[in-house]
From Swiss-Prot:
Keywords: Ribonucleoprotein, Ribosomal protein, RNA-binding, rRNA-binding. This is Large ribosomal subunit protein bL25. One of its GO terms (cellular component) is cytosolic large ribosomal subunit. One of its GO terms (molecular function) is 5S rRNA binding. This is one of the proteins that binds to the 5S RNA in the ribosome where it forms part of the central protuberance. Gene3D superfamilies: Ribosomal protein L25, beta domain (2.170.120.20), Ribosomal Protein L25, Chain P (2.40.240.10). Belongs to the bacterial ribosomal protein bL25 family. CTC subfamily. It comes from Saccharophagus degradans (strain 2-40 / ATCC 43961 / DSM 17024).
């Protein structure tokens, strides 16, 4: 887990709708957002674009418990969804999910692939790594939320495939996919032989022909 603390300051907003949201972004430099979940009603809020953009530059922000200050109150939330402008990539709208210390919740965390260049399939056998996933949906308590999950490729050989079930998950963390059965044990990464690269058998055949 990350030791960083993320704090966002927000203000409640009464006006909703596309027109109002556009005015907020254009005239006030604010990003409309919604906070939902738990036993409370959804709440519309605004966050300054500058403050939100600063946090979005940190990968840990996407998979971390955030303290969201709304006026005189505060909520423990996670970033559940983010809409960006297709041209500028600026944040246009954010969804925050309330979390409880005693209840598990679902979220996605990034996968960090380690030992790619030194894996058997790459270093010794000339293969290349292909990522089938870059994040994994998990369930856990807020205290167990990891910043990321490592996928170790050190012992993966050419032609080898790493599935979700091969990942060593942190304590208290469960895979949503694996909860749904073996059919959902999808590939995460594999090592393949690039096209145009001759294998050992081809080289031996050429040697025999000479």
């Amino acid at each position: 887990m990350s030791n960083e603390d993320f704090i966002l300051n927000a203000e409640a907003r009464d006006v909703s709708g596309k027109g109002a949201s556009r005015r907020l972004r254009r005239e006030a430099g604010l990003v409309p957002a919604i906070v939902y979940g738990g036993r409370k009603n959804p709440q519309n809020v605004t966050i300054t674009l500058r403050e939100l953009t600063k946090h979005l530059e940190n990968e840990a922000f996407y998979s971390h418990i955030i303290t969201l200050n709304i006026g005189d109150s505060s909520e423990q939330v996670i970033l559940k969804d983010l809409q960006r402008h297709p041209a500028t990539n600026f944040a246009m709208h954010a969804d925050f999910l309330r979390v409880s210390k005693t209840k598990k919740f679902n979220t996605k965390v990034p996968l960090h692939f380690i030992n790619e260049a030194t894996s058997k399939g790459v270093k010794e056998q000339g293969g290349k790594v292909q990522h089938s996933m870059t994040e994994l949906e998990i369930a856990c308590l807020p205290a167990d939320l990891p910043e990321f999950i490592e996928v170790d490729l050190a012992n993966v050989e050419l032609g080898g495939i790493v599935h979700i079930s091969d990942i060593v998950l942190p304590k208290g963390v469960e895979s949503i996919a694996l909860q749904q059965g073996e059919d959902h044990d999808l590939p995460v990464a594999s090592i393949f032989k690039p096209k145009g690269v001759a294998g050992d058998e081809d080289e031996e055949a050429e040697g025999d022909a000479e």
